[in-house]
Amino acid sequence: MNYSIILPTLNENGHIIQLIKSIKKNFHNKKNNYEIIVVDDNSTDGTISTLKKFKKKNKKVKIFVRNNKKRNLAESLNLGISKAEYENLIWLDADFQHPPEYIKEIFKYSKEYDVVIFSRFLKKSIRYFDKNIKTKEANEDQSIFFNKLCKFIFYKDITDYTSGYICIKKNKIKNIKLKGYYGEYFLSLLIYCKKNNLSILELPFKEKLRKTGSSKTIGGSKVRYVVVCFNYIISIIKNILIKI
C-alpha cells in the first residue's frame, strides 16, 4: 500500500532529521511505498535549511513552508493533505511524543479500516506526564476533561478525541477542511468520520517526552488555557447542533 506521512513542523531543528530517519525505518522491507511531506510553519531555528540539505539526498521527502504570520496546525495539515499523492494519509507530531515506530501497526489495519487512531486512553496505553511542568499539567488536565466530556456527549466507542496521531483515507475527507486549534480540529474530524459512517479503529500507544522545539499545542499562560478551553466548549456545542 501507499502512504503519505505529513509532518507539521515549528522549530524542530534539533530532531527533525532523526524523526524522518525513524519514519523511514518502517518502510525498510519495501512492501509499502511512501512519501514524507514536511509542512513548516515558518520556523526560525534553522529547521527549513536543515530539511533542504537533507532533501537533496532523500527524494521521498517533500518540503512546504507556510510564510503566513498566523501559525496554525490545522492549516499546515490542510496544505499537507492537498500535496499528498497517496490514498493513505498519516500524520503525527514532529516532536517524538508520537513514536514513529508505531506506524508499522498501521500497516496491519489500514486496508480494513478507513481511520486508524492511536489513543492515549486505552488500557495498554501509557501517557507521559511530568508533574514538574505546570503547562504540561494544565494540558493533561484539559485533555482528560475534554475527552471524558466528548465521550459522554458524542460516541462512547472513541476514547481519544484529541489524539493527533492518525491514518485516514484521503478520499474520505476530500470534502472538508480541518479547522481550529490542536484538539479542536481533531474533535471535529472524528465527529465528521462518525457521522459519515467511516470505520474507525483505536490502537494503544506509549506517549513519549517531547525532545526539543516549539509545541503547536496549547501550553502557555493560564489565561491562554482558559481561552482555549472556551473555544473547545464552543466547538463541542457546534458539533452537538450538527449531530442533531
Regions found by a protein language model. Give the residues of each.
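Short, well-formed alpha-helical segments that are part of the catalytic scaffolds
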Residues: E12-N26
